[in-house]
Regions:
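N-terminal leader/linker segments that initiate helical-solenoid repeat arrays
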Residues: 2-156, 462, 469-470, 474-521
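TPR/TPR-like (Sel1-like) alpha-helical repeat modules
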Residues: 216-220, 320-327, 337-354, 425, ...
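Generic helix N-cap/helix-start motif at coil->alpha-helix transitions
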Residues: 152-158, 184-192, 219-227, 254-262, ...
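Conserved structural position within tetratricopeptide repeats
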Residues: 102-106, 139-146, 182-183, 213-217, ...
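Residue-level recognition of tetratricopeptide repeat
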Residues: 119, 123-126, 163, 197, ...
Length: 521
């Protein structure tokens, strides 16, 4: 067999006995560890998980209805995950890739197996933060569509291309491709997680929420619940996000899937400024799936906040060695910079640039993280140019915040504040967003708003950045106390929320998320 570097082959004499009926993804009934407190995410979702109903992969992803089922093992596990858009172990994905490559070599007209191969390459690239897998994924997915176009029913390959576009941060293309599938087959549930990611990347949280509703109407289980939790988090509905992700972890059917939910719960705890809880969740994720290196970065972040600097440095270094995402390289560089280790910081920044250049060669747009890096580390004018272009492509909250900050660093605080306010309108609560607004407001002589936003940043997460959190405290001290004689009751009377609204942090997970689904989108 040719090496990975020699794939795809130049000559297509290309099918491995295709597994016919994949194993069920979701359990027939509730998970054994389920408690009475953790009811489903509202009545609509509960109805989807009726006892005795087994959700299986799309039949075409198995290679055809007449093919024998795969033997239990890594290929079957990866096939199930790939078909459901769920995370899979790297070793399982590698086995599936080898399996499908051997099959399509002798069965070049098996469009379903080409689609599986392309989606497996994508999953492998995401798992390793290695964008060199993306051209291979695209080649296999387009080969599938050449054999059987999307208009003739090859939705799996088109959904795979849309997911690949999301991975490359090309959210507009992802939305276009996924919407075509949805229009042809609105009951195909596998398209909705891709649409959710695309709409979120484009800053259209209402569109993402609509897609969540449609997904929950069609499908229950871990994948749907995790997708809803991610959207709730982006909208700032933290209790609802925690409820959905807790439920998703309970319904996960593989260690990798469960660990991914636990990692997201750790990230959510970090957003709230709860490093001990974040550490517990990320540690649980790593025990469940030791290969989940994103949780290792989250663990390092929490350790640093808890004063465990040596452990944080060790875990950050291990995380970026195994999962060299540009954002992790930036975080580690800023950690070194906060410790006065300038040479080590510069080494990580050089790795960041090299990784972004490699990603660019494989079709990945890293403009957001590059713009954030340039704004704070010596090239704000370049950051403004880069982020203006990115804003035209993907006008989401993170880009608005990064562009506003870059404008301030480039000497344009008035225009910068306009974008920072857009970020606040588009996104949920973010300590970094609040800090950026507070700094610009102080620069513009708006002491009251500056004080409120800097206080909000530290109240939301007092550990949000090893470089910037100390500056937020210094900025507050410089502003001093508000002048006496101001209004005592700034906000007026605010009634208590109605009983049973599901908005309290200690309420049941089901009622919290049910309340979120009733909100006006």
């Amino acid at each position: 067999m040719e090496s990975e570097d020699e794939w795809p082959p130049h000559r297509q004499t290309l099918t491995l006995p295709p597994p016919a009926r994949p194993t069920p993804l979701e359990p027939a009934g509730p998970p054994p560890a389920r408690t009475a407190r953790r009811t489903m995410i509202g009545a609509a979702v509960a109805a989807l998980l009726t006892a005795g109903v087994l959700v299986v992969l799309p039949t075409r992803f198995g290679g055809g209805q007449d093919a024998p089922p795969p033997a239990p093992g890594p290929v079957a596990r990866a096939l199930t995950a790939v078909g459901a858009g769920a995370p899979a172990a790297a070793a399982d994905l590698t086995a599936l890739i080898a399996d499908r490559r051997a099959w399509v070599r002798t069965h070049p007209s098996d469009d379903a197996s080409w689609a599986v191969l392309g989606s497996a390459y994508l999953g492998r690239g995401l798992r390793a933060a290695d964008s060199s897998y993306y051209p291979r994924a695209e080649w296999a997915l387009r080969r599938s569509l050449a054999v059987r176009p999307a208009a003739r029913g090859n939705a799996d390959a088109q959904i795979g291309l849309a997911a690949l576009a999301n991975a490359r941060h090309d959210y507009g293309t992802a939305r276009t491709l996924a919407e075509e599938v949805r229009r042809r087959d609105p009951k195909r549930w596998t398209v909705y997680p891709v649409l959710i990611d695309a709409y979120g990347g484009l800053g259209d949280l209402k569109g993402a929420s609509r897609s969540v509703e449609q997904l929950l109407d069609l499908r229950g289980g871990s994948v749907a619940l995790a997708a809803s939790g991610a959207v709730y988090r982006e909208r700032g509905w933290r209790e609802d996000a925690a409820a959905a992700l807790t439920e998703a972890a309970a319904y996960a059917t593989t260690p990798v899937q469960k660990a991914d939910c636990l990692r997201q719960l750790g990230d959510l705890a970090w957003d709230r400024g709860e490093p001990a809880e974040a550490l517990a969740q990320h540690s649980a994720a790593l025990r469940t799936d030791p290969g989940g290196h994103a949780a290792l970065a989250g663990k390092a972040r929490a350790e640093l906040a808890l004063g465990r600097t040596a452990a944080a440095r060790h875990d950050y270094a291990a995380a970026v060695a195994r999962l060299p995402r540009p954002e992790y390289l930036l975080e580690l560089g800023e950690l070194y910079e906060s410790l006065g280790l300038g040479a080590d910081a510069r080494a990580q920044y050089a790795r960041l640039r090299a990784r972004a250049a490699s990603d660019d060669g494989h079709g990945v747009n890293d403009a957001l993280v590059l713009g954030r890096f340039e704004a704070d580390h010596g090239a704000p004018e370049s950051a403004v140019e880069r982020l203006r272009a990115q804003w035209r492509r993907t006008p989401n909250a993170a880009v608005a915040d990064a562009l506003g900050w870059a404008l301030y660093r480039a000497g344009e605080p008035e225009e910068g504040l306009v974008f920072l306010k857009q970020a606040a309108e588009k996104g949920g609560r973010s300590a970094l967003f609040s800090y950026h607004r507070g700094v610009l407001e102080r620069e513009l002589g708006q002491s009251g708003p500056a004080r409120r936003d800097l206080e909000e940043a530290l109240r939301t997460n007092p550990y949000f950045s090893p470089l910037l959190a100390p500056k937020a405290r210094e900025g507050l001290e410089g502003l001093g106390e508000p002048a006496e004689g101001g209004p005592k009751d700034v906000y007026g009377y605010v009634p208590d929320p109605p009983t049973g609204s599901g908005s309290s942090g200690s309420g049941s997970s089901g009622s919290a998320a049910a309340a979120a689904r009733k909100r006006k989108q």
